[in-house]
Amino acid sequence: NTNVVEYRHGGALCAISYNHDYEEEIQLCPNESHIITCIVTIGIDADGATLHNMDMQRRGSKKLKEEFIKVLDERHLDISNESLSKLVNLNLNMCYYFSLSETLDTKELVAMTSRSPRYYVSSAFWARDVYLWAFPSIVLANRKKARELLNLGYTRYRKNTAYHALYINGNILYPGFELDELVSVIIATEKYIEMTHDDTILEIPEYKDTVKEILSQLEDWYEPSLGLYRT
């Protein structure tokens, strides 16, 4: 049977459906172990979560695992040093999967600094973390997704990207101008072109509008007596 848990605050916020793909009873002796695969799906209501769970059950955990391993193998970076290779690829995949996600309701791409509830701005957007720290790994992992992430910087996050932290919808969470965050998407664009040799991104109107926006904001923070920008 498929079990469903709904989280509500007025209307349903989300639903989690879970199941396992085994039926037999398992008895374990001391020091024995057995792996059980549980299928967990999430939706904005019980029907959606349950139907996704049923679909994954039909495909089976073995097939799903094989498909995911294939994705990881295609992304794998070959490094001669075995211990270094393990570390690099572990960090590459962690950076990719934990810094990016999609919204449940609209399936829009969102970028975030942390998913941990222990972090004081969990699931918030920081331009520094996304475009200066995580971005090179995202380019290595998925070039198409990296370009999509740049487009977010040219649109959703453009107006407020210089502020300390934003909600994932682009509104200001923590005020405070930070110079490196203002120019972070431009630095990321340069890195993208350097790594992919795809300079067509410079021709899209949103990029040109972003450059104009950044130059306009810079003027407000320039101190002519020092020749420096405040931050």
Summary of predicted features, one role per range:
Residues 19, 166-170, 231:
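Conserved alpha/beta core surface patches that mediate binding of polyanionic ligands
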Residues 1-124, 200-201:
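Acidic/polar, glycine-enriched structural segments that form the non-catalytic walls/loops
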Residues 98, 102-104, 220-230:
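C-terminal ends of transmembrane alpha-helices
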